[in-house]
From Swiss-Prot:
Species annotation: Aliivibrio salmonicida (strain LFI1238) (Vibrio salmonicida (strain LFI1238))
UniProt cross-references to Pfam families, sorted A to Z: Ribosomal_S5, Ribosomal_S5_C
Phylogenetic placement of the source organism: Bacteria, Pseudomonadati, Pseudomonadota, Gammaproteobacteria, Vibrionales
GO CC, one annotated term: small ribosomal subunit
Family as reported in the entry's similarity comment: Belongs to the universal ribosomal protein uS5 family.
Descriptive protein name: Small ribosomal subunit protein uS5
Length: 166
């Protein structure tokens, strides 16, 4: 249990969006709040969560818990991506490509938060279509999980890394 707590504390947490939503009932409207968060270790692990509650802090806490339970591992290359990649979820499309050292994170909104917590320091990225934060986060994570390192490609093809890079 102590090791699990230690692991959870060294994660970077970012709140992307808080939204007030309502349910209409016979007596009027019932308001509640939703929160979208991402957590990452800055070294290739990332998770996202979406929580809903009657109060904002409770919604944020729920989404953070879901994000910690829903972690993915991304193959990074010294603070950038191995190759250009596209991601798509419903109406949101994202394109990300590696950038040279010193470029920084050139991305907007929800995509920037995802790239910061996962540990990408240099990337060029663009979101097309719907900019709904939930869909952009999902599209970005789908794109990042499809990144393959040269070692992964070599293992899959049964070749050496040198043979692939020629």
């Amino acid at each position: 249990m102590a090791k699990e707590q230690q692991q959870a504390t060294d994660l970077n947490e970012k709140l992307i969006a808080v939204n007030r939503v309502s349910k209409t009932v016979k007596g009027g409207r019932i308001f509640s709040f939703t929160a979208l968060t991402v957590v990452g270790d800055g070294n290739g692990r990332i998770g996202f969560g979406y929580g809903k509650a009657r109060e904002v802090p409770a919604a944020i806490q729920k989404s953070m818990e879901k994000a910690r339970r829903n972690m993915f591992t991304i193959a990074l290359n010294e603070g950038t991506l191995h190759h250009a990649v596209k991601g798509r979820h419903t109406g949101s499309k994202v394109y990300m490509q590696p950038a040279s050292e010193g470029t920084g994170i050139i991305a907007g909104g929800a995509m920037r938060a995802v790239l910061e917590v996962v540990g990408v320091r240099n990337v060029l990225a663009k979101a097309y279509g719907s900019t709904n934060p939930i869909n952009v986060v999902r599209a970005t994570i789908l794109g990042l999980t499809s990144v393959k390192s040269p070692e992964m490609v070599a293992a899959k093809r049964g070749l050496t890394v040198e043979a692939i890079s020629e």
